[in-house]
Amino acid sequence: MATIPLFFSLILFLRLYHASRLEKRKEVEGEGIVAAEDLVSENDNPQGDDEVLPVHFIDQAAIVRTSIINYTFRYNEVLDAAKLHRGLLQLLKIPGWNKLGGRLRATKNGKLEIHVPRSFSKTRPEVKFSHVDCSDTEIESHGLASQLPRPTGSTPSIQEGCHAFRSFALPTDLPNNIEHYWKNDQPMLSLHITSFANGTLVGLTFPHSLTDAMGTSEFLKAWSNVVAGKSSFVKPLQGTQVDVLGDVGTNLDKKASQGEFFLEDQQTRGFSLLSFIARYMWDVKTRRSIRTKHIYLPAKYMSHLRQGVEEELKRQNGGVVPFVSDGDLITAWGARMVMSSSTWKNCSAVICNVFDLRGRLKGTFARGGTYLQNLILPATTVLSKEEAATATTAQIALGLRKAIVEQTDDVQSRRLMRIARRWFSSMGSMPLFAKWDSRVVACTNWTKAKFLDAADFGPNALIAGGAGNQKSSSTRKAARHTEPTQAQTQPGRPVMYWGTTLSVTDNPRDTFVIYGKDKVGNYWVHAYLREETWSLIQKELDSFR
C-alpha cells in the first residue's frame, strides 16, 4: 500500500470496508466468479492504427499497476552502449516481442491497455534510450559510483540502498509517477546506460504492470541472446492477446471451486479489516523513518546461520532435520529482526512470501513458452501474538516452508487465485490473511530469476580494444589468486545488480527483496526498514565478526 495523504487514506479506508462487505454478501448469496475477457476499446486508441494489447488480470491490480520497477546491472567491463541498444531494437522485431515497445494507456473506464505502434519512428521510438558518457573516469574515482555496493569478503555488511543511485538507474527526465505513462505517448521501456573507464551500469525501467521478476529474466535472456548473435535461441512470446490465467480461479476452474483454500476462513474482513487499515494508516502517518539499504550476507555467514537453525530443528524434531531453503532462512532471519523491533511489541504478525505461478499450475502454460506478465501470489505465514514475540529464526523458517508446501501446489494456487480475483476486483490488493492487530512482513525472492545469468551479454557486447576492458581482464586474473570468497565473472557478465520500485507514492516498510546469490554462495538483500530494525541488524552482524 502506498503512502498517501490522510484524506485519500480515509477514502481508501471507507472503500475497503465497503468492498469487504460487498465481498462477504456475494459469498453468502453464492455469486460465482466468471472468466473476465481482456477487452480493449478502439475509441481510446489515440493513434487509430496502433495494435492494442490487453493488460491482464493481475497486471490490472492496483498494487501492481501503480508501481514502476527498475533493475540496474553493474559490469566490470566497458560495454558497447550502441550495440546493446541495437540488440534491444532487434529483439522487438521478433514476433510478439514488440509488446515491449508499446505505450501504456488508461481507458475511460480505468482499464489499462498496451498500444503498440504498427511502425516505430524517431517521434515514436521503441525504447526511451539514454547514454551518459563518463569514460574518462573510473568508478572508484567517481563521487557517487564509488559508493556502489560491493562485497566485503567473508564479513557481512550493510551498505547504501538503491535510491541513492537513482541517477544511474534512469534518465533525469523520466518521472516516477505512473500517470506519466498513461498520459504521454512514451515507450514503456527505458534503457539508461552509464559508461565509465572501467565499467558500465545498465538500467532498465518500466511499469510493473508489464511483467514480474521471472518475466523480466526471460526478457533479459532474449535480449542477451540477440546481442550475442543467437536470435534463434529466443523463445516465442506467449499470452500477448489472451491471459494465460483467464480461467484460473473462475467458476470454469473445477479445482478452484470444489474446495477451500488452506487459509480461506482466515481472510481479514469486517471490523478486523477496518482495524488493520486504521493501524497501518497511523503507522504510515506517524512513523516515517523508513530507510532503504542493502545487506551483504557472505557464504560464511549463511553457513553460520544454517548451522544454528538446523541444530535447533534437529533437537526439536527427534534428530531429523526438516528441509528449509536459503530463502526460508533469510526471510525468517529478517522477520525475526523486524519483530524484535520496539514498534512490533504486543501484536500478531503475518509474513507474506511472493511466489511464482509458472510451473505450479498443471496444464496451464505452454511448454517452453515465455510470458511477459505478472504471475504472482502471496504465500502467507500467520503468527499469533505469542509466536511473534518468542519464535526463533528456526521456528519461523520451518513455518515459512510449511506455508509454501501447503499453499502453493496446483489446487491450492487455483483456490488462492479464486480469492485473489475477489480481492483484486474489489480492493485492488493481494488477499490478506491477518488479524486486527497484525503487522506484515513482506518478502520477494528473486533467486530463481537468476538475473546475473540472464543479463550475461558475453564478450560480444564489449567495446573492441577498449583500454578499460584490458585492465578489467588483468584485474580478474589477479582476483583469482587474492579473493577466493568472491565469484569471478566472465567478460560481459554482471557482477551485481539492484532492483526497486520507483513510484512517487510507493513507500514499502518491513519489506525484504532477496536478489539471489553469486557462484560462491554470497547473497545480496535489499530492505525497507525502520531505524530501530537497522540497528538490530547491525548489532547482529557485528556479533559475527
Curated annotation (Swiss-Prot):
The keyword Translocase does not apply. The active site is at 208 (proton acceptor). Glycans are attached at residues 70, 198, 346, 445. Residues 466-493 are annotated as: Disordered. Residues 1-19 form the signal peptide. Pathway: Secondary metabolite biosynthesis. Keywords: Acyltransferase, Glycoprotein, Signal, Transferase, Virulence. GO terms for molecular function: acyltransferase activity. Its EC number is 2.3.1.-. Induction: The botrydial biosynthesis cluster genes are co-regulated by the Ca(2+)/calcineurin signal transduction pathway, which is under the control of the alpha subunit BCG1 of a heterotrimeric G protein. Expression of the cluster is also positively regulated by the cluster-specific transcription factor BOT6. Belongs to the plant acyltransferase family. PANTHER family: FAMILY REGULATORY PROTEIN, PUTATIVE (AFU_ORTHOLOGUE AFUA_3G14730)-RELATED. Acetyltransferase; part of the gene cluster that mediates the biosynthesis of botrydial. Botrydial is necessary for colonization of plant tissue by the T4 strain. It is a strain-dependent virulence factor since highly aggressive strains like SAS56 or B05 still retain substantial virulence when botrydial synthesis is impaired, since they produce also botcinic acid. The first step of botrydial biosynthesis is performed by the sesquiterpene synthase BOT2 which catalyzes the cyclization of farnesyl diphosphate (FPP) to presilphiperfolan-8-beta-ol (PSP). This is Acetyltransferase BOT5. The gene is BOT5.
